[in-house]
Amino acid sequence: MRFFLAITALVAAVTAAPSADVAAVNQMAAMTLAEADASCGNGASLYCCDKSKQGGDTGSPGQAGGVGLLGAIVGVNGLLQGLLGQCSKININAIGAAGVLNQECTARAACCQNTPSVAHHGLVNIALPCIPINSLVG
């Protein structure tokens, strides 16, 4: 009886799990550089982030850090830096705004703040300088 209940709960959990949003995936595939830059908004620029990227204009566009509880996770050498890796700015003026985003950035495109990100002293401090663009589209 318990085995049947466990299997039923597992099946219910799997069927209730959200599926990939096909419209958002298609929108990301056809997104131009101008649309991606507009998604970033004011005060942020479009970057291409890749863990294995070396050389060129790489580095953190802003300092992510804090002295609070999550400072070690989000800090300059923290866990979240590994999610995006090294980032280089996509110069839209040099490339042209009509270019397709996934042709110019085969890794992960992100919107990064133009000013350093600072988390002030407190219990939970999160200062994220970059946000993946696929989390802004949808």
From Swiss-Prot:
Domain of life (superkingdom): Eukaryota
Keyword Lyase: no
Expression triggers: Highly expressed during the whole fruiting body development with a 3.66-fold increase at the ST (sclerotium) stage compared with the HY (hypha) stage. Expression responds positively to light irradiation.
UniProt signal peptide: 1-16
Designated gene of the protein: HYD3
Protein name: Class I hydrophobin 3
Species this chain originates from: Cordyceps militaris
Subunit-level organization: Self-assembles to form functional amyloid fibrils called rodlets. Self-assembly into fibrillar rodlets occurs spontaneously at hydrophobic:hydrophilic interfaces and the rodlets further associate laterally to form amphipathic monolayers.
Family membership noted in the UniProt record: Belongs to the fungal hydrophobin family.
Keyword Hydrolase part of the UniProt annotation: no
GO molecular function: structural constituent of cell wall
Disulfide bonds: C40-C111, C48-C105, C49-C87, C112-C130
GO CC entries: extracellular region; fungal-type cell wall
